[in-house]
C-alpha cells in the first residue's frame, strides 16, 4: 500500500509518499523526476553500501542521469566543511540550476543536502529520501535545513522545501536497535505535544513498533507526517505555532552541543529533553498533572530511551546553550512546555532557578 500526503505551503506544494519498496525501479512513477533529469545523490558512507546502488540502478533504468557524493557519517559532520564539499563537487562538474539533489540518509544528510540546494546558484530542487525513523517522521518534512556550529545546533541554515519526500519503510529494517529507538523519541514528542489519542495508541502498540510490524509502522509514520504537515502549513517559517514541535529540543540541543555532537544521538538527547520539559512544567505548577508525567516517563523507559541527561553535565551547563536557543530573546529563555498530554504552550522568560531545579530533580 502506498499513502500520499500533500504539503501545501506559501512557497509551493509537494507530496510525502509513504510505502514499502519505493527505492525500487517499479515505483519510479511516484518520484517527481523524469527521463533525462540530472540528479546527484548525496549520502554517507554508512548508508551508501546498503542503498546507493539500488537507487542508482533504479534511476538509470529510467534514463535519469545520476551522480553521487558520499560524505562521512555522524552528527559531527553536519558542518560547514561538509557543506563546502557538496558545493565544490557541484561547481567542479559545472552542474546547472536544473540539477536535482537527492538526500539519501538520515537527518544529517537531509539537512546538509537541503542547505546545499538552497544556496547553490541561489536555489535548486532537492528530494528527501529519509532512511531513518527519525528522519522519516520529522527531519525530512517542513523545509528546515542547516548545519551545526560550536556555539549551537542548527545555528546556520535556511528554509528550503523539497519537491517531494519519499519514505521507504523498508529502510527501517536495516536500522540498528539504537537508531530505531532514537526515532521513537520524536514520535513520542508528537503525541505529547499534539495528540493525546495518538499517545494512547503508542502505549498500546509500542511493542508492535519494536517488532517492525508493517501495519503499525505504516500507521505510525503516516500519523506523524500528518501532524507535522498540519503545523508546517500554518507556520512554514517557524514564527509561531511551529515552535510546539520543539518540545524538549531546547534541553536536548544543549546536551548535543555540550557533548560536541557525539556520544548521544539526537533522539536520545530529545528524549531526555522531553523529560526535562515535563519536570519544568511540574515545577512551575498548574500545568501537566503528575499522572500524565508518569505516563510519559514510563513510555520513554519502555522505548529504552534516557529520561535524564548525561551524568557529567551539571544543571548550570545547560543554561549557556539554552540562552542561545533560537526561541530565546535578549538572554531570556523561552520554553515549550506540556500543559497535558496532547497540549503544549510556549512560556516566555522562564525563571532560570526553575529550570535548574527541574533538571536537578528530574527523577519524578
Curated annotation (Swiss-Prot):
Binds 1 divalent metal cation per subunit. Can use either Co(2+) or Zn(2+). Pfam families: DHQ_synthase, DHQS_C. NAD(+) binds at residues 73-78, 107-111, 131-132, 144, 153, 171-174. The keyword Ribosomal protein does not apply. Pathway: Metabolic intermediate biosynthesis; chorismate biosynthesis; chorismate from D-erythrose 4-phosphate and phosphoenolpyruvate: step 2/7. GO terms for biological process: amino acid biosynthetic process; aromatic amino acid family biosynthetic process; chorismate biosynthetic process. It comes from the Bacteria. Zn(2+) binds at residues 186, 249, 266. It catalyses: 7-phospho-2-dehydro-3-deoxy-D-arabino-heptonate = 3-dehydroquinate + phosphate. The keyword Ubl conjugation does not apply. Its main location: cytoplasm. Keywords: Amino-acid biosynthesis, Aromatic amino acid biosynthesis, Cobalt, Cytoplasm, Lyase, Metal-binding, NAD, Nucleotide-binding, Zinc. It is found in: Cytoplasm. InterPro entries: Dehydroquinate_synthase, DHQ_synth_AroB, DHQ_synth_fam, DHQS/DOIS_N, DHQS_C. GO terms for molecular function: 3-dehydroquinate synthase activity; metal ion binding; nucleotide binding. Its EC number is 4.2.3.4. One of its GO terms (cellular component) is cytoplasm. Belongs to the sugar phosphate cyclases superfamily. Dehydroquinate synthase family. Catalyzes the conversion of 3-deoxy-D-arabino-heptulosonate 7-phosphate (DAHP) to dehydroquinate (DHQ). HAMAP family: DHQ_synthase. This is 3-dehydroquinate synthase. The lineage of its organism: Bacteria, Pseudomonadati, Pseudomonadota, Gammaproteobacteria, Enterobacterales.
